[in-house]
Amino acid sequence: MLNNRKIKLKIKEKEVIEKHITTEFIRLDAFLKLCDAVQSGGHAKIVIQDGEIKVNGEICEQRGKKLRVGDKAEFEHKIYEII
């Protein structure tokens, strides 16, 4: 016998936070600190190595990844976009 229960899912929209940089690029770990997404460089290193960060939709484990205008980093249901 099939179970006919209905399940409701509530999908939380991700908050988009825009950050302006004045240089050609910024390293991923420094960008996370600039956005206050992490508390320290050590914390940034851990979350990046653990695969918790997506850059432009792809998991990124490169702490020194260079981000430029238009790039997006995603962490804990927030999207940080470089403008």
Q: What residues fall within each predicted segment?
A:
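Ferredoxin-like alpha/beta domains used as RNA- or RNAP-binding modules
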Residues: 1-35, 59-83
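Residues that recognize and position ribonucleotide moieties
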Residues: 24, 46, 53
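Short beta-strand/loop turn elements enriched in aromatics
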Residues: 34-47
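Short, well-ordered loop/turn sites that connect or cap secondary structure elements
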Residues: 47-48, 67
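Short, structured beta-strand/loop micro-motifs enriched in basic residues and often containing a Trp
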Residues: 50-58
